């Protein structure tokens, strides 16, 4: 049966890095809702980053299936489907390949043989969307970490993806740069109806999401809306996750509902 509301579906997926090693993922099944922000959270070793690698084809499943827009991903169709998915990694320096900003954004377009005039238009539009057009001629060493991640997002946007994966993309940023990047991602999602998948150990980032998948020891531990997940905060701490500051304060105040944003915390106080 077709699932028109999901862009990516994992069905009974298991994976191990070596044939004699233990399984990193064990019979994992979940749906990524189309056009929403899904956050996949877990501590180190939970399997969340392996999920990202499987989504973009760095690794292949050992058993089970992955579907993209109701098509089972195979060796024959993967390259075509992969063009719809962009990814932003943890370290901005490791993904900056151009000598200046605009060349970095153009790199992926060149690989797809996009005509020069269209390439110029797409680069300018993408940089404008992330507020980096005025820095188009800057070298990477002239940019902050947050600005480099904005360029990485522009490089993805220029390729017109349907899905953007953020693989710990905010973990090396200071709090202000982190929040600015999350605000940008929310804006991009809204304006382009793009599906966002954030892979993170940071539960405060999951508070931004429409849908949350909690991984633990290679299995799906919990799944639901942010409110549903954080209303059972004690279960998150039980598997070694650190609760966001507003939720910790909310618990100290003795309130029954665990989910609380920073804005909500201010109202409470």
Swiss-Prot record:
Recorded topology in the membrane: Peripheral membrane protein
EC number: 7.-.-.-
SUPFAM superfamilies for the chain: P-loop containing nucleoside triphosphate hydrolases
GO molecular function, one term: ATPase-coupled transmembrane transporter activity
Enzyme's top EC category: translocase
Recorded name of the encoding gene: ecfA1
Annotated keywords: ATP-binding, Cell membrane, Membrane, Nucleotide-binding, Translocase, Transport
Family matches, as SMART domains: AAA
Role this protein plays: ATP-binding (A) component of a common energy-coupling factor (ECF) ABC-transporter complex. Unlike classic ABC transporters this ECF transporter provides the energy necessary to transport a number of different substrates.
Protein family (similarity comment): Belongs to the ABC transporter superfamily. Energy-coupling factor EcfA family.
Protein name: Energy-coupling factor transporter ATP-binding protein EcfA1
Keyword ATP-binding: yes
Description of how the protein assembles with itself and partners: Forms a stable energy-coupling factor (ECF) transporter complex composed of 2 membrane-embedded substrate-binding proteins (S component), 2 ATP-binding proteins (A component) and 2 transmembrane proteins (T component).
Species of the source: Staphylococcus aureus (strain N315)
Matching Pfam families: ABC_tran
């Amino acid at each position: 049966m077709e699932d028109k509301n999901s862009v990516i579906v994992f069905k009974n997926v298991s994976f191990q890095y070596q044939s004699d090693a233990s399984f990193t993922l064990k019979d994992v099944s979940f749906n990524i809702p189309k056009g929403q922000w899904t956050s996949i959270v877990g501590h180190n070793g939970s399997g969340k980053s392996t999920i990202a690698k499987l989504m973009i084809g760095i690794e292949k499943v050992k058993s089970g299936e992955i579907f993209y827009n109701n098509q089972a991903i195979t060796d024959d169709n993967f390259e075509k489907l992969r063009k719809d998915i962009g990814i932003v990694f943890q370290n901005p320096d490791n993904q900056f390949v151009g000598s200046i900003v605009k060349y970095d954004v153009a790199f992926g377009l060149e690989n797809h043989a996009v005509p020069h005039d269209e390439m110029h238009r797409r680069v300018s539009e993408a940089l404008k969307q992330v507020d980096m057009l005025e820095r188009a001629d800057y070298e990477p060493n002239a940019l902050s970490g947050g600005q480099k991640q904005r360029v990485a997002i522009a490089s993805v946007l220029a390729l017109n993806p349907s899905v953007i994966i953020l693989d710990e993309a905010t973990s090396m940023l200071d709090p202000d740069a982190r929040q600015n990047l999350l605000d940008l991602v929310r804006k991009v999602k809204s304006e382009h109806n793009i599906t966002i998948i954030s892979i993170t150990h940071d539960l405060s980032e999951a508070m931004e999401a429409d849908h949350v998948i909690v991984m633990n020891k290679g299995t799906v531990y919990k799944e639901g809306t942010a409110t549903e997940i954080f209303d059972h905060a004690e279960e998150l701490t039980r598997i070694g996750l650190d609760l966001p500051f507003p939720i910790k304060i909310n618990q100290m105040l003795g309130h029954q509902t665990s989910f609380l944003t920073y804005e909500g915390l201010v109202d409470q106080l």
